[in-house]
Amino acid sequence: MRINHNIAALNTLNRLSANNGASQKNMEKLSSGLKINRAGDDAAGLAISEKMRGQIRGLEMASKNAQDGISLIQTAEGALTETHSILQRVRELVVQAGNTGTQDDTDLGAIQEEIANLVEEIGDGSGKNGISDRTEFNGKKLLNGAFADGTATLTFQIGANKAQKLDVNIEAMSSNALGAVDAVTGDLVAGQAVADIDVKQFAAPTPSLTFDQQLDIVDGAIKQVSNQRSKLGAVQNRLEHTINNLGASGENLTAAESRIRDVDMAKEMSEFTKNNILSQASQAMLAQANQQPQNVLQLLR
């Protein structure tokens, strides 16, 4: 029997330290809910998890961006709904004015007065108080041609990574930009915009714009607004599907990241209980090991 080196006590102390360390790690994981709290816990898992977290947060922001894009489109489309309503009324008035057999100059003047007010409400894009001038989203004027094709684009970042964007154009929807369109070039016919409508000319023997021409102006304007609303509706539908896809991708990626980083509480609690029992047993055995050298005294009596 040796008393200078108590090997049994040293072995038991090492096991006690190991069990206490394991218990502390168990408690750390249980209190944080994570099985990776530092790089030393799982270096590769931490790197993968952090990359996934960046992607998840990017997907969440992309979804918010798409929602903001829908809000912008709804703002523009709502304004165009009113523009449509105005143009339908203008068409009705042009048809009424075309009944020159029962209209005199006073009647045509009254009709033109209402048309002029309606056209003014559409706005001429010059910044005055019309729908095309005051329709804006976060300071961006949407219907004055600022984002027409070939001018500028509204860019929506709808993905978590680069090159995942959606560019949108909104043509000018002002009274100077809406009207009769050349069937060949697709351009607005000069002098035949909604702003040029003047039904008082119907009283003249040779009006500069005949009834047929002025009706074509309104019909062309209605078609232009319809086309723009259709394009905006298509973009809105796309963004809604984008949001659904981003949500599904984020959900799946979150589940994958959780499997890497989150702790299994039941399993970890079992490990903690085991290590705690082993620690208590080690303490008891250490006391026994420390008692063994005392037995040497029995030999010295």
Predicted feature residues:
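Primary detection of the long, small/polar-rich alpha-helical "axial" segments characteristic
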Residues: 1-301
